[in-house]
Regions:
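Cytosolic-side transmembrane helix boundary signature
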Residues: 45-83
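Conserved alpha/beta-hydrolase fold motif
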Residues: 178-180, 393
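C-terminal regions of proteins
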Residues: 396-450
């Protein structure tokens, strides 16, 4: 017969104290975690790195509780949870793109200007300068902005702002199109909002101040928590991480013209008033997830005659529906895993960088069509003012252009990761090919003078 040592009451009390402290700290951590999920300001206050550690701790605790119940009840609750997620996904859609309401009898994007009409109106506003006999050429600027998260947004907006300041407003006067993907689109829109505020003295400071804000923490805490449960919820208590990113763009501690602009509907970018100065064309590039087709949100009509099979996302909206500027930017910046594909009528859209990370494709199609129109005009009248027009493409790259070093890879990487490495490499190659096609087209138009 075995005898077991009796535990001293002091040891039991110590264990109780430790357990009490553990539960107390866990409860405090849970309160902080839930507060970060619900409050944009609080998530920014505690910042991204603590959110990562806290979220992993909460998820680990939840996993251990499931394991405890599984062991006690002799039922695999982990398996039940995974099956519930799979089944629930067939009946819910947690990643709808958030649309705003407009006039219920009006399709706000139905009568957008086509490219040629917009170009003619844009040129008419500059007719006197174009016909000035002292001018030998009239440059028109197209901007391409590479994607690359917040870094590319900050870089793009800073470069554009510096151009505007150094040229004393001449740059924006001759700016015809802003095209970009992912963070590049955010940089384009930040500059667009700030320079429309008509204060060059504060332009650079304003865009840099806005883009220095923490846009990561709030969507990150949604990613590492409630987004896992969304397929199980018939009613969304909180929205997904993409909506959290939109909210972060719309609300900053010190509001400025850019954050106010992000709250506006994209329809405010349309050129609807004949008396209003023509706005530049905006192209926010994205990709349809189901088939990898290129898509774009633009303030002009994206028709098949000019843009081929490129999807015009705004045509998918019904009467009485609109989309905010922030939502539009996020739709083209749904970075792999960090943001889910956004759903509009069962069409899912992801980051523009999957297909074209610079926005060169849509600009190339514009220039082809406009140059054809210019050539037709010059055939009729060789002295037409169009002969002075010269298209200039400003490509704001996110990384130094250097040749990739081709070297041996480990056999295990070859066997296990070759498809992944090839797919990742194809994204950059597709963008480079689009950029090169545009460059060669400009070389051909201007006889090698770029």
């Amino acid at each position: 017969r075995h005898s077991f040592p009796t535990r001293r009451s002091s040891d039991l009390q110590t264990e109780k104290n430790i357990f009490f402290l553990f539960v107390s700290f866990s409860f405090i951590g849970l309160i902080v975690y839930v507060s970060a999920i619900l409050s944009l300001a609080f998530s920014r206050y505690i910042t991204s790195l603590p959110i990562i550690f806290l979220s992993f701790g909460i998820l680990l605790g939840a996993g251990n509780i499931l394991a405890l119940f599984s062991n006690k009840q002799k039922i695999n609750f982990h398996f039940i949870f995974i099956v519930a997620l799979i089944v629930g996904g067939y009946f819910t859609e947690p990643h709808h793109v958030v649309l705003s309401k407009s006039d219920p009898e009006k399709e706000v994007y139905k009568n957008r200007q086509q490219l040629k009409a917009h170009f003619k109106d844009w040129i008419t506003e500059r007719k006197l300068k174009l016909e000035d006999e002292t001018r030998k050429e009239y440059p028109i600027y197209f901007v391409l902005a590479d994607g690359g998260a917040s870094r590319s947004a900050y870089w793009t907006a800073s470069v554009l702002s510096r151009l505007e300041i150094e040229t004393k407003g001449i740059f924006s006067e001759k700016l015809f199109c802003l095209s970009g993907a992912s963070g590049g689109s955010l940089g384009n829109m930040a500059f667009y909002a700030a320079y429309h505020n008509n204060n060059r003295d504060t332009l650079l400071r304003e865009v840099q101040q806005y883009l220095s804000n923490d846009f990561l923490s709030f969507p990150l805490v949604r990613l590492m928590g409630p987004d896992i449960l969304l397929p199980l919820l018939p009613v969304q208590i909180v929205r997904d991480r993409a909506v959290a990113l939109e909210q972060a763009m719309k609300s900053i501690p010190q509001e400025n013209s850019i954050s106010r602009f992000m709250k506006k509907d994209f329809s405010e970018l349309l050129n609807q008033d004949d008396k209003e100065r023509k706005k530049p064309i905006v192209c926010i590039n994205c990709t349809r997830m189901q088939d990898g087709s290129p898509a774009v949100l633009s303030n002009i009509e994206v028709n098949k005659e000019v843009f081929g099979n490129r999807i015009d996302v705004l045509k998918l909206l019904n009467k009485g529906e609109d989309i905010s500027v922030a939502t539009s930017v996020v739709l083209g910046a749904r970075f792999p895993y960090f943001s889910p594909a956004g759903s509009i009528k069962n069409q899912y859209f992801v980051d523009g960088g999957y297909f074209d990370n610079s926005g060169a494709g849509v600009v190339h199609e514009m220039i082809l069509e406009l140059q054809k129109m210019i050539n037709d005009s010059l055939l009729i009248n060789p002295n037409h003012p169009y002969k002075k027009i010269k298209f200039n493409v400003i490509h704001i790259a996110n990384q130094p252009s250097e040749e990739i070093k081709i070297q041996k890879i480990h056999p295990l990487i070859n066997d296990l990761a070759a498809p992944i490495k090839t797919i990742i490499g194809s994204y950059a190659s597709q963008t480079n090919i689009n950029d090169l096609r545009l460059y060669k087209n400009l070389l051909e138009i201007y006889k090698g003078d770029t």
